[in-house]
Amino acid sequence: MFLMPTSSELNSGQNFLTQWMTNPSRAGVILNRGFPILEADKEKRAAVDISTSFPIKGTHFSDSFSFINEEDSLLEEQKLESNSPYKPQSDKSETHTGFPCIKKGPQVAACHSAPGHQEENKNDFIPHLASEFKEGAYKDPLFKKLEQLKEVQQKKQEQLKRQQLEQLQRLMEEQEKLLTMVSGQCTLPGLSLLPDDQSQKHRSPGNTTTGERATCCFPSYVYPDPTQEETYASNILSHEQSNFCRTAHGDFVLTSKRASPNLFSEAQYQEAPVEKNNLKEENRNHPTGESILSCWEKVTEQIQEANDKNLQKHDDSSEVANIEERPIKAAIGERKQTFEDYLEEQIQLEEQELKQKQLKEAEGPLPIKAKPKQPFLKRGEGLARFTNAKSKFQKGKESKLVTNQSTSEDQPLFKMDRQQLQRKTALKNKELCADNPILKKDSKARTKSGSVTLSQKPKMLKCSNRKSLSPSGLKIQTGKKCDGQFRDQIKFEKKVTSNNKENVPECPKPCDTGCTGWNKTQGKDRLPLSTGPASRLAAKSPIRETMKESESSLDVSLQKKLETWEREKEKENLELDEFLFLEQAADEISFSSNSSFVLKILERDQQICKGHRMSSTPVKAVPQKTNPADPISHCNRSEDLDHTAREKESECEVAPKQLHSLSSADELREQPCKIRKAVQKSTSENQTEWNARDDEGVPNSDSSTNSEEQLDVTIKPSTEDRERGISSREDSPQVCDDKGPFKDTRTQEDKRRDVDLDLSDKDYSSDESSMESIKHKVSEPSRSSSLSMSKMDFDDERTWTDLEENLCNHDVVLGNESTYGTPQTCYPNNEIGILDKTIKRKIAPVKRGEDLSKSRRSRSPPTSELMMKFFPSLKPKPKSDSHLGNEPKLNINQDQPPGDNARSQVLREKIIELETEIEKFKAENASLAKLRIERESALEKLRKEIADFEQQKAKELARIEEFKKEEMRKLQKERKVFEKYTTAARTFPDKKEREEIQTLKQQIADLREDLKRKETKWSSTHSRLRSQIEMLVRENTDLREEIKVMERFRLDAWKRAEAIESSLEVEKKDKLANTXVRFQNSQISSGTQVEKYKKNYLPMQGNPPRRSKSAPPRDLGSLDKGQAASPREPPEPLNFPDPEYKEEEDQDIQGEISHPDGKVEKVYKNGCRVILFPNGTRKEVSADGKTITVTFFNGDVKQVMPDQRVIYYYAAAQTTHTTYPEGLEVLHFSSGQIEKHYPDGRKEITFPDQTVKNLFPDGQEESIFPDGTTVRVQRDGNKLIEFNNGQRELHTAQFKRREYPDGTVKTVYANGHQETKYRSGRIRVKDKEGNVLMDTEL
């Protein structure tokens, strides 16, 4: 029906966090190390622990829970009934009760081994079960059934008390048998575990739930085969029979372990051999009947308290389970057990530890040879080892010390381990602190050996912390090892073992060694812690105190070690989680109060308050508290020696001390290493004070000694231990011993409250939470919850949500809190009511015992509406379970010495105080409501005023806007007027301007007068010149007439000359040689005749000079005409430089006309005319007038040829410019360059090398070189070059391409790349450096 937990299930505890993220208030943070079973499940945690310890995979947690509740009560009945056949019946009762299918001894053994394993399953299974169970518990009629089961359980607990006596007798008988069996089976870790299981089974008749839980807590893998389990069961039965009380106490411890099964599994593994030896020693040294009776009475009371506390712790574990996704620690498994069962088991374990302490003291230390093997690290453990350096240091220390002690003390160390483990659990089960007076005695002895143990304890604690990282494994191993010795202690050892899961592989001896050294360490560190729980338990159970007095030192050290280990482990995990959170926050989250990371940390701290501290670095709540915690830790050891007396003397002081330790728990957490060092340095004082603190506030002792490591391990148990610690504080003066009277505690708490008003005091808030949980348990869970809620009202909404978690977890924690008392108490309200920390805390330590007893008594009363509102799970279930658990605890307290009464008194006082504060809160709430109404009215008035003001403002703004517009219009008008005025002012001249104007006017008048005078002159001159012009015109006319006459004369003379020449031609023919001379002579004669004629004719003219002067222009015109008529005649001026020729020319001159402007015109016989201008220019006109040659004064020569060609010679540049009639212009330069400008705009330039360049009008150029190369330049700048060999080149801005006649094309790009395409299709590409990039050869 129910399968044993598999390794995956065992590991599922690590994954349970993902299953518990449904609660928004938990915000992804696991509030408690224990699995988040319903708050209703808190009370049923004992049953649930039993059932969950049995791996119930397919069962809904809610169903299994109700079933377990029924089975829990049934188990108790069956165990009571099965007292005689302890081994089979207890097995059956446990098995049958837990799960009917598990009825056989082997199965029971498996179940016993399974508990730790199943606790791991709880870790794995509980997440599912817890979530499902919470949902089912809220929705399922299981709540009603649970309440009924609680009532039945109370009845059955009473029956159990009666049956326990009978069972004790039977156990005594079977103990003797089992002692013989155990003596042979002690060496076997399974056997040692089996006796514990059996003893638990025998206890289970008294503590049916406890025994079953113990059985469930033991991992099934501890005993792989049923025969082993049977042997284990038989050994456990014998061991339990021999140490029934211790087993009962161990059951209580186991219950705590169930709360943190990993720790207990380790603790059990480590303590299993120790318990075996201790059981043997106890069986040998102590009459089984007496020890069993005393232990049984204690167990009965503790079972009831453990049931309540286990329920609370179960709840607490549910809270703890919410802390965060990290390696689940042993505390988770512990929380699975119901608080009552857990308390019972712890009580039994503590009693057994006391017995074992006595046996150890009597027999001496048992050498622990094997060094506990360390299991594989689980998720988060790798970092956790480093984050919890303290825990590791203690672990290493423990292991070393354990090795030393193992040689020195085997059984005593085993006892000390158990007791210390139980103390650790006792921290969880604060009731165990009642035994601290006795434990103190032993813790003194332990303080001696515990000092070594203390040093060892850190090592073991470190190992346990590592194991706590892998809680399920730790639990299982612890269960294996410690089961044989005593299941209660095994549960503590489970916690320890879960912490020391690494040590588990070496099973009994390694674990025992770890436990021993760890117990020693705890004896130093944890002796106070376990002493506190022990004193509480002692206060509740005088029999257990008697038993514990013998085992007190061992139990105290063991419990303290367990607690320290668990706390360190939990703290290590929390630190690891916080470290991971910090890393995550550094990457993703901004550190704001509203950030999810901060909320996670706060919730984690709340959950730490509930079960563990999240922060790797201890929160520094109050340095003052931390310092007191250090003195306490320093004084704990010395006080631990006197802790019994002090616990008796000042139970109240323990509460204040516990309060202070609670308040300083965070400080201790903050300074855990220092505190631990200080505690370890002054271990005697620290142990004593730790014992007081364990009684007062395990969290303080945990905080001070191993505040982080122990808190890691102990936070879950610390919840129960808080409750127990509260009750034991109240019950045990020793608990109050360190702090002084309990009243002082409250006073200090009030002061602390004032100090703790800083929200950082998580111990205080944990005290508040434990106080609230106690309140919830005690008077009225509803009222206390409402009270705590009212206190929490002072906190923010997050505090409320935390409160919800804390309250729900508190109900769980109430049981756990009674067990753990301070640590959990410190934490839950730490988060919940930071503001109310002081109040809650003050009340919490004061009423922790009362609330514990009252919560037990008043679990039945309905939870307050406030609590129900915030914690619906608390509505039905926490009442019945918590009430049932509280009643047994109250009964136990009643059965126990006046310490319980004092504790219940203190709880009642706390409840009264809480009620008073609630009234205050109500009054304050009323006043706040009035203030709120007043504020709302004031706000309404303010809104009206604002509206009126807005209206008025709008009106004013409109009016102002109108006024503004009007003013703007006025300003515009004024501006226009001003502009006109300024314009007029600018136009009106000033004095200087007027003077200037006057001066200018005067000047203008003067100029006008001058102008008139000049005009008169000009007019006279003009008239005179006009008359002259007229006269010159007349003269010109006369001269023209003369020219005409002279022209006629010239023509006549020329004709005569021709006639003469014609007559001379004959002679020329005859005389060729003389012809030229004659002709010249005739010309000369004719010239002379003409000249004579002219001379004769000219004198006859009236004004020959004028005629001569006026004639040249006519002659020039006639010469021009003549040359135009004969253009073919070459220009003569350049051709006649020779003076002789001039002479001849002079001879040929027929006439010479001098013009008035200085121009001289010469007429030659051949009809040519030469005109000499005054500036040196000479113009020659041919006879026909077609050829005209003009030689300018600067040397330039212009020739007009008969074909209309115009040749102009530039002398300076030696360039000839020839213009043809068709418009062609040819320029001949001196360099030989010839330019031709065609009419269409084309230009042809022929260079001296015969290169021809053609420039076209469209911008193209063509150059033809002598070799035949042609270069054409396109308009876009591209050049096309055609070579005479047929190659062609194209030059562009991007590339240059050459095309060869064979079809090869070579392209060179601007970047230097060359591309060659061959006719065959081959392409070769080269880079600028000539490297071939591509070459495709076809």
From Swiss-Prot:
**What PTMs does it carry?**
Phosphorylation at Ser-590 and Ser-596 by PLK2 is required for procentriole formation and centriole elongation. Phosphorylation by PLK2 oscillates during the cell cycle: it increases at G1/S transition and decreases during the exit from mitosis. Phosphorylation at Ser-596 is also mediated by PLK4 but is not a critical step in PLK4 function in procentriole assembly.
Q: What is its main location?
A: cytoplasm
Annotated spans, Interaction with STIL:
896-1338
In which compartments does the protein localize? Cytoplasm, Cytoskeleton, Microtubule organizing center, Centrosome; Cytoplasm, Cytoskeleton, Microtubule organizing center, Centrosome, Centriole
Location of region: Disordered: 78-99, 190-211, 387-415, 437-480, 522-552, 612-790, 846-903, 1088-1158
Provide one Gene Ontology cellular component. microtubule
Region called Alpha/beta-tubulin binding, residue ranges: 320-395
Q: Which UniProt keywords apply?
A: Cytoplasm, Cytoskeleton, Microtubule, Phosphoprotein
Q: Where is the composition biased (Polar residues)?
A: 401-410, 680-690
Q: Name one Pfam family in it.
A: Tcp10_C
Q: Composition bias, kind Basic and acidic residues: at what positions?
A: 542-551, 636-651, 718-765
Q: Name one GO biological process term.
A: regulation of centriole replication
InterPro entries recorded: CENPJ_C_dom, Tcp10_C_sf, TCP10L/CENPJ
MF annotations from Gene Ontology = tubulin binding
- The annotated regions of Low complexity compositional bias extend over 781-790
- Phosphoserine: modified positions: S260, S317, S541, S590, S596, S760
Describe its function. Answer: Plays an important role in cell division and centrosome function by participating in centriole duplication. Inhibits microtubule nucleation from the centrosome. Involved in the regulation of slow processive growth of centriolar microtubules. Acts as microtubule plus-end tracking protein that stabilizes centriolar microtubules and inhibits microtubule polymerization and extension from the distal ends of centrioles. Required for centriole elongation and for STIL-mediated centriole amplification.
Family to which the UniProt record says this protein belongs: Belongs to the TCP10 family.
Assembly and binders:
Forms homodimers. Associates with microtubules plus ends; binds to beta-tubulin subunits exposed on microtubule outer surface at its distal tip; also associates with microtubule lattice. Associated with the gamma-tubulin complex. Interacts with the head domain of EPB41. Interacts with LYST. Interacts with CEP152 (via C-terminus). Interacts with STIL. Forms a complex with STIL and SASS6.
Which protein is depicted? Answer: Centrosomal P4.1-associated protein
Organism from which the protein derives: Pan troglodytes
Q: Taxonomic lineage per UniProt?
A: Eukaryota, Metazoa, Chordata, Craniata, Vertebrata
What is the gene name?
Answer: CPAP
